[in-house]
């Protein structure tokens, strides 16, 4: 006869002071586990959780922040995600005095330059007149030349005189014509008037500047009555 012995396993209990059914052995924390919190991290957006999981071993009980800040978020259905962001921050310093002065100066007109102020105070003593201050009868007597002819040729001569012989005369007018009885119809030839400081300058001008033969040159002197 064969005897078969059936061994019954010891009863398992679920007491807190037993491990795997062995009485007298208390459950100890697993090796490498760090401090845990009593409850889950609060699900507050944009606020770092102080204790996230049991995987942060070797930290002090205060669970200080690392260089990375972790923000918990809750999705629909109760699921949680962790979003890690860098702790870098940008510090904006105060505005410099130069930029503030620049913003203030845009609201007021610029002050005149010292050279411009001095130039406005200085009277014109030379016989040479400034631009916009042409005076045909300055001094009571002015030697001049009238050059008449075809309008286009007179204009070309005036352009050449201003470009190449500017130091040989005082002032020169634009090309002008006489007008008719009605409207602005031009009559006669185109004319320019050239003024000089004295008769000597006029003689030097006429002796050194070539004038086309089809243009007529008249020496005149303008004076007041």
UniProtKB/Swiss-Prot annotation:
Question: Does the record carry RNA-binding as a key word?
Answer: no
Q: Which UniProt keywords apply?
A: Host nucleus
Name the segments for region: Disordered.
Answer: 1-67, 85-128
What InterPro entries does the database record attribute to this sequence?
E2/EBNA1_C_sf (IPR035975), Nucleotide-bd_a/b_plait_sf (IPR012677), Papillomavirus_E2_C (IPR000427)
Q: Which GO terms describe its cellular component?
A: host cell nucleus
Q: Give start-end positions of Low complexity composition bias.
A: 92-108
Basic and acidic residues bias (residue ranges): 116-128
Give GO BP annotations, semicolon-separated: regulation of DNA replication
Which Gene3D superfamilies does this one have? 3.30.70.330
Q: Where in the cell is it found?
A: Host nucleus
Main localization (coarse): host cell
Q: Which GO terms describe its molecular function?
A: DNA binding; DNA-binding transcription factor activity
Q: This protein's superkingdom?
A: Viruses
Name the job this protein performs.
Answer: Plays a role in limiting the replication of viral DNA in keratinocytes. Recruits the host NCoR/SMRT complex to viral replication foci to mediate repression of both viral replication and transcription.
Q: Which family does it belong to?
A: Belongs to the papillomaviridae E8^E2C protein family.
Name of this protein: Protein E8^E2C
- UniProt source species: Bovine papillomavirus type 5
């Amino acid at each position: 006869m064969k005897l078969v012995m059936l061994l019954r396993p010891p009863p398992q209990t679920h007491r807190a002071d037993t491990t795997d059914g062995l009485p007298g052995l208390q459950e100890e924390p697993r090796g490498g586990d760090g401090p845990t919190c009593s409850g889950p991290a609060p699900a507050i957006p944009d606020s770092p959780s102080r204790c996230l999981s049991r995987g942060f071993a070797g930290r002090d009980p205060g669970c200080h922040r690392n260089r990375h800040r972790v923000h918990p978020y809750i999705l629909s259905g109760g699921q949680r995600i962790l979003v890690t962001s860098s702790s870098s921050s940008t510090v904006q310093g105060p505005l410099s005095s130069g930029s503030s002065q620049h913003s203030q100066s845009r609201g007021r007109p610029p002050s005149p330059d010292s050279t411009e102020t001095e130039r406005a105070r200085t009277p014109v003593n030379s016989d040479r007149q400034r631009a916009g201050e042409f005076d045909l009868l300055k001094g009571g007597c002015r030697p001049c030349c009238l050059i008449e002819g075809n309008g286009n040729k007179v204009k070309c001569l005036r352009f050449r005189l201003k470009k190449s012989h500017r130091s040989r005369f005082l002032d020169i007018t634009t090309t002008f014509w006489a007008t008719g009885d009605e409207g602005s119809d031009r009559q006669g030839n185109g004319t320019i008037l050239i003024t000089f400081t004295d008769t000597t300058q006029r003689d030097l001008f006429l002796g050194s500047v070539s004038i086309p033969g089809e243009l007529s040159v008249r020496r005149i002197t303008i004076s007041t009555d």
